[in-house]
Amino acid sequence: MSYHVYVSNAGSDYFSKFLLDTASGALTQEDNVDLGGQPGAVATNADGSLMYICLRSAKTYQSYRVNKVTGQLNLINKVDVPQGGPYLNTDNTDRFLMATYYGAGAVSVHKINGDGSIGEKPLQWIETEVHAHSIQFDRSNQYAYVPHTNPPNSIYQFKFDEITGELSANDPHKVQPETPEGPRHFVFHPSKDLLYSVNENGSTVSAHHFDANTGQLISFQVISTLPDDFDGENNTTAEIRMTQDGRFLYASNRGHDSLAIFDVDEDGSLTSIGHQATEATPRYFDFDPTGTYLLSIGQTSGRMATYLVNREDGSLEPMATYEVGDSPLWIQFVPKE
């Protein structure tokens, strides 16, 4: 099977475009996708037929229909927003588009219409606090979480109505680490009620118990992403991912320029098992949809590195590097038909 791979380049006006052969892990570079503005965050619906892109320089969200044979993007519509947000995501029904606003300190909800277009006006604009960085939903689609780096060093907790698209404050409305860790992004365990946040300011990962009945998070571990001999003042973290079987967790270090690798115990606790050197300033990385390969982009190197994932011990075997655009910050996969 093959996948279209799009790399969002914040310093260029285009996506870098590749075709991934999952049998070999090889990437074939194709023509860039011109977007007419500097792209940032990207989201798709579940089958990859619709793509939503934040053009940060133009302050717009744009909806595209994806030709899954060729990978071509066909514009459906675009809507103006006060500022380009650092994160886009759809809820689990693909009926609503969520965005966070780092500078404004807010979350928005837009309706996704039947034709894939984005509703012109947001259904909701919720002020939280400055440095709102991402938003994701639990498996039930009943709860959403918005991490904020330090300050305010908190994760906002919301209830979500998947019929109306309304977000409402859970009780308590936010949880805060005891130390200024600065939660940025997070992942849920694939089968257990656990949530892991990567913390930008503290260069740490926090493990949380997730109460599926109330939506509440309770932290039970904070662990460093860095080797003991590296000065944390020279590092921030960026992205976090977990293998499909829930055995290994990875977090990116900007400064140490590595992917921290953790073993996940049966009780959800983490143990550091090593670091893999990667491209400079690894703002984003992700597994391909099969979980066989990991792709990591360097925001300051302008390159993407690929790795073969060892499913037995979690280690990463370097495979190849590819030139992309300026300041890459997102990777999106779409299955090829």
Please state what every model-predicted region is.
Residues 145-205:
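Loop-centered beta-sheet repeat module
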Residues 28-34, 74-79, 120-126, 170-177, ...:
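A short beta-strand motif characteristic of beta-propeller blades
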Residues 1-26:
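An edge-strand/N-cap motif at the start of beta-rich repeat modules
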Residues 10, 56, 102-104, 112, ...:
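Short loop/turn segments immediately following the C-termini of beta-strands
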Residues 14-15, 59-61, 105-107, 152-155, ...:
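Structural signal for beta-propeller blades
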Residues 36-47, 79-96, 127-141, 177-192, ...:
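Beta-rich, blade/repeat-based domains predominating
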Residues 18-25, 64-71, 110-118, 158-167, ...:
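Short loop/turn segments immediately following beta-strands, especially the blade-tip
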